[in-house]
């Protein structure tokens, strides 16, 4: 499917060059990772693992611990 809205996908490094800051890793919890924008000081949350993969991973880990 063609991108009809003409969005450009940029990496964090490219975005840092455009806005004058960079994203610094803060922490990860579950399928989410938090970054801090060094220019604005705002904390940004990105989902870095899809929900289904994370859920199945948690279930598999629990089953593995239960039956070991």
Swiss-Prot record:
Biological processes per GO annotation: defense response to bacterium; killing of cells of another organism
GO CC annotation: extracellular region
Propeptide: 1-21
Compartments where located: Secreted
Pfam families the UniProt entry points to: Lactococcin
Keywords: Antibiotic, Antimicrobial, Bacteriocin, Plasmid, Secreted
Primary location: secreted
Effect of residue 45 to A/D/E/F/G/I/L/M/N/P/Q/S/T/V/Y/W: No loss of activity
Functional summary from the UniProt entry: Kills Lactococci by dissipating the membrane potential of the cells.
Protein name stated in the entry: Bacteriocin lactococcin-B
Species of origin: Lactococcus lactis subsp. cremoris (Streptococcus cremoris)
